């Protein structure tokens, strides 16, 4: 092996570790694993944590850059990779290790999809679930959800992966296998490595197995859809709802373009320029009472129409909302998707400001606001003249970023064409904790092999 070319040596060693069937080097197949136009030299699909450890250990010794990958649903997020030799796919890490519904815990490998987990849990007894609802729920893997700390509308009631995870098994950049936490919900001794890895985008370690808290399935779920003519009216209703004793699981505000693009899968009010969708979970009597009270509350703000969705229609609406971004990219080329975070009380104000900025530049945007969380997704539909308008899109991003910062928040470009990524920092303005993040990366990954260039500040 000493006399082999480096590329042949890499392939040979990976085959030794995981077996020939789990090493992909066909140029045509590698295209599917490209990130921002960069194609890996090889894709490897280890089947155990030990195999992941051996692959990473070898890559570290040979200074080979690794990009971890689950289903690829979030692969467009982040900066352009500085280097990408190996894509390490977790697709073969797809087993449930322990399902203990009596103690409300689940241990599963990182390549398992959330959809598969939820389907299995729903069949146990009266049903259980992992209270996470990130985008791309049908494809998103547990590892990808945790690595990006991805969340959805139900974050309002249940929190994020950071609140649900109680244990991890991961491989650090030197190949060491690290175990932190466990099945005990209140495990607080020592440093919390779980929290360190959540939202690190695969730059500090590769998640292999995780333990989560579970909850029993609610007796009923429903959605109340309310249409409004003006953003001020929709926001006024949402403000009162947030301050009330009612307990929705999610509150969404959609502008007219977002409603239009979702109409294929919706049974929602067609009238009005804005839609407020309120998710509810619990016992039947509680949901019926809350729907009645919310409907009366909305009348004070001039609601045009109200619709209640149950069962399949309820599920179809939220699936369509979570998959909104992927539907747009399937339908249009060069879509730009941005995620803003700010104070919850500023949701309506920021949405209104974003609309004025986009209208001033003649740009069409679909907006979906998680109004219960202080999160706003802005999806830019570039149209036919994308190349000639790149500077306008850059100006839009810069102005929206400034508006988010003004409201004590931030903006991240979650997906965009490479031409946009080359002109803006997709992570937005520098954070005050950047030096801490940089030092952590240097300490844990001194060889610089994991997801290089894709995280905050080009880490």
Go through the PLM ranges and name each one.
Residues 2-4, 39, 64, 69-71, ...:
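Conserved glycine-rich FAD pyrophosphate-binding loop
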Residues 9-13, 232-261, 344-362, 393-404:
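Short amphipathic alpha-helix segments
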Residues 14, 34-66, 84, 90-136, ...:
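N-terminal glycine-rich flavin-associated loop
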Residues 21-35, 66:
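N-terminal glycine-rich anion-binding loops that anchor highly charged ligand groups
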Residues 33-36, 77-82, 266-268:
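Short glycine-biased active-site loop of nucleotidyltransferases that positions the nucleotide triphosphate
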Residues 47, 226-230, 278-284, 340-344, ...:
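Short beta-strand-to-loop capping motifs
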Residues 51-54, 116, 232-236, 284-292, ...:
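Short, conserved charged micro-motifs
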Residues 147, 166-331:
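C-terminal substrate-binding/cap subdomain adjacent to the FAD-binding core in PCMH-type
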């Amino acid at each position: 092996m000493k006399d082999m070319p480096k590329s042949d040596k890499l392939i040979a060693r990976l085959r030794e570790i995981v077996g020939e069937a789990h090493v992909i080097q066909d140029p045509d197949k590698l295209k599917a694993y490209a990130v921002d136009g960069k194609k890996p030299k090889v894709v490897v699909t280890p089947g155990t944590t030990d195999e992941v450890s051996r692959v990473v250990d070898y890559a570290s010794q040979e200074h080979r850059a690794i990009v971890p990958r689950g289903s690829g649903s979030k692969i467009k997020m982040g900066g352009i990779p500085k280097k990408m030799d190996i894509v390490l796919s977790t697709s073969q890490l797809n087993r449930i290790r322990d399902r203990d519904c009596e103690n409300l815990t689940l241990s599963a490998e990182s390549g398992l999809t959330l959809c598969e987990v939820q389907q299995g849990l729903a069949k146990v007894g009266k049903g259980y679930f992992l209270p996470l609802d990130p985008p791309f729920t049908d494809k998103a893997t547990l590892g990808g959800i945790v690595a990006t700390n991805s969340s959805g509308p139900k974050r309002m009631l249940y929190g994020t992966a950071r609140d649900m995870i109680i244990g991890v098994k991961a491989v650090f950049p030197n190949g060491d296998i690290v175990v932190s936490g466990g099945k005990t919900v209140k495990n607080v001794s020592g440093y919390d490595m779980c929290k360190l890895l959540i939202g690190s985008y695969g730059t500090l370690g590769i998640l292999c197995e995780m333990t989560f808290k579970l909850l029993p399935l609610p007796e009923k779920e429903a959605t109340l859809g309310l249409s409004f003519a003006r953003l001020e009216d929709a926001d006024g209703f949402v403000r009162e709802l947030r301050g009330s004793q009612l307990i929705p699981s999610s509150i969404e505000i959609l502008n007219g373009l977002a409603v239009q693009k979702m109409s294929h899968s919706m049974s929602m009010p067609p009238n009005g320029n804005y839609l407020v969708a309120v998710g509810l979970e619990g016992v039947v009597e509680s949901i019926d009472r809350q729907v009645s009270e919310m409907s009366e509350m909305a009348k004070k703000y001039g609601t045009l129409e109200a619709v209640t969705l149950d069962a399949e229609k309820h599920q179809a609406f939220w699936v369509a909302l979570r998959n909104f971004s992927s539907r747009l990219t399937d339908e249009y080329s060069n879509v730009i998707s941005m995620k803003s975070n700010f104070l919850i009380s500023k949701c309506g104000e920021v949405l209104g400001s974003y609309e004025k900025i986009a209208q001033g530049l003649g740009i069409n945007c679909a907006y979906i606001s998680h109004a219960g969380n202080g999160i706003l997704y802005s999806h830019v539909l570039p149209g036919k003249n994308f190349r000639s308008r790149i500077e306008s899109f850059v100006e839009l991003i810069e102005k929206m970023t400034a508006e988010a910062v003004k409201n004590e928040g931030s903006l991240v470009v979650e997906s965009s064409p490479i031409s946009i990524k080359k002109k803006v920092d997709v992570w937005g303005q520098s954070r005050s904790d950047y030096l801490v993040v940089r030092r952590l990366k240097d300490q844990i990954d001194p060889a610089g092999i994991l997801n290089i260039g894709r995280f905050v500040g080009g880490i």
